[in-house]
Regions:
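A flexible loop/linker signature enriched in serine peptidases of the S9 family
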Residues: 3-10, 19-34, 38-41, 45-52, ...
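Long hydrophobic segments that form regular secondary structure
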Residues: 70-77, 82, 86-87, 331-390, ...
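Disordered, low-complexity segments in secreted/periplasmic proteins that are enriched in proline
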Residues: 302-321, 366-374, 399-412, 450-470
Length: 878
């Protein structure tokens, strides 16, 4: 009924007499005369004063988005709230680097080894570029001019070159003296990953993906030349996060065994990660041989370690010497040695400034037991030669609390991002939550001298070929927790300028990260020009997010949006549930309705059953005229006290005290009831011959549940796989890999019946159910099911929301979703805005719902029964 050719139409509202519709169009109000079809803009002029002062002073305390240490370790450069500061690491004295006159975001600072320069990322020019300045922030110089994202800012140890990666899949070097930029290497697939420079500044190690999306570590001359893969594809599945040890003898990196998509793993088997050390030179002895075969040798090694612990001037001079890194390429890959037991997910790596130790972050990934799998997670220092592992004192428990507004940028992958050793090797600095912490290290934790003692074996002082790599006893740590590096600074905040910064930052991030460079046909520059003038009249962040959402809406894409920010919503009142439904009765009291299986009230020791009357709750008489929900808002851990009777009266009633369920737990109970009801429909309609399972989400827990449900249905003749109301995730390939299995044999043992060899597969007819609420990966799954010819799909077209998405934290702490990869079928169909069509179309209408029927499930059973009727039983089924 409207004919506008531009803008967006929002919030139509019809008058009570049905004659007029008022709506919002192109930032104005319009009126539609229903009878004539004519539209007219409603002119409104509102004069108002600003309700808040747009300029304010905020006190920022201890926030750190990113940091790096000065060469002396006495100061650190930090980024916070888009500004750069240097701070004394011992007393919190803080100095702001020269401030910009306009709102901008400066982040990811890196201090050169000679102390003369600080490099950082800044969007002060209108796009993310790399700048360098002196430590006071004077004479800033922009060294890049590329209209794309950059990352992995890394200084060479001699401070002559600055390396960085860019979204054009290249690794660049910038010469500080001559200002020349050169290409070091490039990738054919994606951006260069982690980057690390050798101690002599002659070599660079980096990771990049191959065509199968496996990450590999390479070494190349920093001046340019042949790059070499450091490992063997037959030995290691993937490598990344390479760092050089300070003595130049080892390249240390992480390696994974098996494939993981970040949500679940191939076949549901957990992917493991381990730390590996690659000896760069030929070795004339077994590195695992400690020559500690008796007590005397063990005591001598410990004495040598204690003597070296003081280090003194000679030790300092040795540490300052620059090693000449020599690489013996022959047999390089076979000199790789696993340092830690697989199972731990290893995060950042940082080399110690001397010797052959590295610091790392680790989280428990379910290792296969024993050894140094950093059980429980944390931060550790690992001597890659001796295998000694020492736990670093953690940040206090409150360290994870913070504003949550930092570090959302292009995630530099330089060595040791987030962990830095002090030059004296006595302190390790790291970020935790929103703060910066300093952890004291035990003597000989990470020096070459520390390795002289050998790895202390489990039963004594070690032995030949048995490096310990055990996590050190916590009592050896010099402090229970790390010390926070504290500071306080007052910042003047121009909220109008901040909103403009966030708007443009969000626009630029979508420009650089949206999976379709053509922006789904939208003129992205023109879109910004349409909405940017509105910034002048915005009054708060909610209005900012509204126009940003409208701007993003021009992309006509899913998995997008802006949320959160500096003014988080207050926590919602927690409603809790007793585990049964209340049904109004003519007596004026409520009756107990359905009791949820495995819920709070589903226990033999509770004297309560459907049909009982609830006379009161917590001494409040409960009548059908009362809103019982107000009594369901209680604190966690408290109990409901119900007065229950088998008749509508207090006389003879008894007390039932129930610990209620929180909202998410009750949602699980409701979901389980819904699944049971669908399963009952299938069982009754097929006389028990057809099985049923539902996939709630496309995540690891749902994959495990799917495998359990599949095993429970393995004796059924056919199977309904329901994935309606599934919001997606990333396990479609795992599911299809299981379902695509075909039976080619069976076994019969003596005095035993027919046995199927693989309970994790299903070999009978199958259908997949979908609806308009099946989204993202829950669309890729039925599309793959159809393409592989595994069976028919029943229901209605899916949502049409299939993009691989990420997220970016904007300067004000809000988050913008960034769809970075599209999905196409093998027939070149882009699945975004597509909607997978079913083979058999059937919808559930409101009338069916009111009658308690699920027509889609009934149709799925009908399809399978027809399939079964047309099949001949196999020998195994006869």
């Amino acid at each position: 009924v409207t004919r506008h050719v531009d803008g967006n139409l929002f919030w139509p509202s019809m008058s009570s007499d049905g004659k007029v519709i008022v709506y919002e169009e192109l930032f104005g109000l319009w009126k539609l005369d229903v009878a004539t079809g004519k539209t007219n803009e409603i002119k409104i002029e509102i004069s108002a004063d600003e309700k808040d002062n747009e300029t304010d002073v905020e006190t920022v305390t201890n926030e750190v988005d990113a940091f790096d240490l000065s060469p002396s370790g006495r100061r650190a450069v930090i980024s916070a709230r888009g500004q750069l500061f240097t701070i004394a690491t011992d007393r919190g004295d803080i100095t702001r680097l020269a401030a910009d006159n306009q709102a901008s975001r400066n982040q990811f600072p890196k201090w050169s080894a000679d102390g003369k320069y600080i490099a950082y990322m800044s969007d002060k020019s209108g796009r993310d570029e790399i700048w360098i300045s002196d430590p006071e922030g004077r004479s800033p110089k922009k060294i890049t001019d590329l209209d794309n994202e950059k990352g992995a800012i890394v200084w060479t140890p001699d401070s002559k070159l600055l390396l960085y990666t860019a979204a054009d899949k290249k690794l660049y070097s910038y010469g500080v003296a001559d200002g020349k930029t050169m290409t070091v290497t490039s990738s054919d697939v994606n951006r260069i990953g982690s980057v690390a420079v050798s101690p002599d500044s002659k070599w660079v190690a980096f990771s990049k993906l191959d065509r199968t999306l496996r990450s590999h570590v390479y070494i190349a001359p920093i001046a340019g030349g042949e790059e070499r893969h450091v490992s063997d594809d037959r030995l290691l599945y993937a490598e990344s996060n390479a760092v050089w040890t300070a003595d130049g003898r080892y390249l240390v990196f992480t390696s994974t065994e098996g494939f993981s998509n970040g949500i679940a793993t191939q076949g549901g088997i957990g992917t493991t990660m381990a730390l590996w050390a690659l000896a760069l030179q030929d070795q004339d002895r077994d590195p695992m041989n400690r020559d500690i075969d008796n007590e005397a040798q063990g005591l001598a090694a410990e004495a040598a370690a204690r003597q070296a612990g003081g280090r003194g001037q000679a030790g300092a001079a040795a540490a300052a010497a620059v090693p000449d890194v020599r690489i013996d390429w022959g047999g390089l890959a076979r000199r790789a040695r696993q340092v830690t037991v697989p199972g731990t997910t290893i995060g950042a790596l940082a080399p110690a400034p001397e010797g052959h130790a590295v610091a790392l972050t680790a989280s428990n990934g379910g290792g296969r037991g024993g050894g140094n799998d950093a059980a429980g997670g944390g931060m550790f220092v690992v001597d890659v030669e001796s295998g000694q592992v020492t736990r670093v004192p953690p940040a206090p428990a409150a360290a994870n609390e913070g504003r949550g507004g930092g570090g959302g940028g292009p995630a530099p992958a330089g060595a040791g991002a987030g962990i830095v050793f002090a030059r004296d090797v006595r302190t390790l600095y790291f970020r935790s939550g929103a703060g910066l912490y300093a952890a004291p290290l035990a003597p000989n934790t990470n020096t070459a001298a520390g390795a002289a003692a050998g790895g202390a074996g489990r039963g004594g002082r070690g032995g030949r070929g048995a490096a310990s790599a055990e996590v050190a006893d916590a009592s050896a740590a010099p402090a229970a927790t790390a010390r926070q590096v504290t500071y306080t600074v007052n910042l003047e905040v121009d909220r109008k300028a901040l909103r403009a910064q966030v708007f443009n930052e969000g626009w630029r991030i979508m420009k650089n990260r949206f999976y379709d460079a053509k922006m789904h046909g939208a003129n992205w520059n023109a879109v910004r020009e349409m909405y940017e003038p509105l910034l002048e009249n915005l009054v708060d962040e909610d209005e900012l997010h509204t126009i940003m959402m409208m701007m993003i809406g021009h992309l006509n894409a899913s998995h997008t949006g802006v949320s959160g920010g500096p003014n988080p919503m207050q926590a919602a009142v927690q409603t809790r549930y007793p585990g049964f439904d209340l049904v109004a009765d003519a007596s004026g009291y409520y009756k107990v309705g359905h009791i949820y299986k495995n819920g709070p009230a589903d226990h033999d020791y509770f004297k309560i059953k459907p049909g009982d009357f609830i006379v009161s709750i917590d001494d409040h008489e409960l009548k059908t005229s009362d809103n019982y929900w107000r009594y369901f808002t209680i604190a966690a851990g408290n109990k409901f006290h119900f007065l229950v009777n088998d008749r509508p009266a207090r006389d003879g009633a008894w007390d039932v005290a129930i610990t209620p369920a929180a909202g998410p737990a009750f949602a699980d109970l409701q979901y389980a009831r819904w699944v049971d009801e669908r399963r009952d429909i299938v069982t009754k309609a097929s006389n028990g011959e057809i099985g049923y399972l539902h996939i709630r989400a496309m995540d690891a827990p749902s994959l495990r549940q799917f495998q359990l449900d599949l095993a429970a249905n393995r004796t059924k003749k056919a199977l309904v796989i329901d994935q309606r109301f599934n919001g997606g995730g990333g396990i479609d390939q795992e599911l299809l890999g299981i379902l695509a299995g075909r039976q080619y044999q069976y076994t019969i043992g003596r005095d035993a019946g027919f046995q199927q060899p693989r309970p994790q597969n299903f070999y009978g007819p199958m259908v997949v159910m979908q609806n308009e609420r099946s989204a993202s990966d829950a669309e890729m799954f039925p599309a793959g099911f159809k393409a592989l010819g595994l069976g028919k799909v029943v229901g209605v077209p899916t949502m049409g929301a299939v993009i691989g998405t990420g997220a970016y934290t904007l300067l004000d702490g809000s988050t913008i979703r960034t769809p970075a990869s599209g999905v196409w079928t093998t027939t070149s169909q882009n699945m975004e805005n597509y909607g997978v069509p079913p083979d058999v179309f059937i919808d559930n209408l409101p009338g069916d719902f009111l009658k308690g029927r699920d027509m889609q499930v009934e149709k799925a059973v009908e399809v399978l029964k027809a399939d079964l009727a047309g099949r001949k039983p196999t020998t195994a089924q006869q």
